[in-house]
Amino acid sequence: MTGITQRTATLRTAALRAACAVACAFAAQHAAAQPPAAAGKTVVYRTQAGDTLYDVAARYLQGADDWQLLQQINGVPAPKHLQPGVALKLPVARLRKEKLTARVIAVQGTAERASGGAFTALANDATLAEGDRVRTGPNGFVTIELADGTHMSLPPDSQLDLKSLRRTVLTGTLDREFELTRGSVDSEVTHLKKRDDRFQIRSPSVVAGVRGTRFRVNYDAAGNASTRVEVLDGTVGVAGHRQAADATLVHANFGSVSTASGAVGAPVELLAPPALAHPDKVQDEPDVTFDVAPLAQARGYHVQLAHDAGLLDLFRETRTDAPRAVFRDVPNGNYFLRIAAI
């Protein structure tokens, strides 16, 4: 017998009919279009007993010779003699960043990674780094966890590049950037604590940035190069690469689509989460079957099975035009179900 628990309250998907390319980015976050003046921006470091310009530059800036830049900016006559409590200005453009990693916490079916070479199979607890590419096959699922607890899940036929995973040493500011080149990625982002923290997902035409929310980005690489964004919790700014400073805010339970050129469509309310017609049905047949209470505006239904209540360890999914989903060869066990209208 197979036990199934339905989990629908946290997922609401839109019937978005336009063929578009979408992405999200808060204007204040988007890093690709920072003005040249940002190179002159500084942050303050309070000197401590025993500090020298050499030490400060070595700890917090990018190059060994950056002490000379510190001396020039701050007018320090003696680089080896700094009084404690002095407010030193450090140039933001030269702040040193340390590379972070991500961890694979769930993998099912065909899931692979490439680190500048050939693809190799992914396994649970594998470590991913900046520059890695992750892809799933027709039956593959993978979920990765970032250092702050953010989760990103790839369903079948998806590909995600880890473009930047960094932390600024002095300020602790996080900089995470990903590029979705095929399929979908579901993200549950831990709320960003610092003003300059950045979390972005890019498609070939748009960028999606948030400060703490749950949302999905889908890029249709095989079709019309459209990108779709659905916001499940919080707020996301949506803009094309060329209009990133003019973001359209999309709130929870709304979605947006844009053209491949980055023109953003108006937010559209998502459909209500579907319910099972027979939630107490005992699944004791060879095929596991779910009947969905039909929604008048739905064109179809997306049904997923997971091993865990958080729906991070997904292992099967299907899309159906009819309000019935059938899964074959599901081992006996207790599973969790997610249904979305499309």
Regions found by a protein language model. Give the residues of each.
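Flexible, surface-exposed loop/linker segments and immediately adjacent secondary-structure boundaries
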Residues: 83-87, 92-286, 301
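Surface-exposed, short loops/turns at beta-strand junctions within beta-sandwich domains
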Residues: 327-334
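Short beta-strand segments within Ig-like beta-sandwich modules, predominantly Fibronectin type-III
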Residues: 314-321
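Short proline/glycine-enriched turn/loop motifs at strand-loop junctions of beta-rich domains
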Residues: 64, 107-108, 295-300
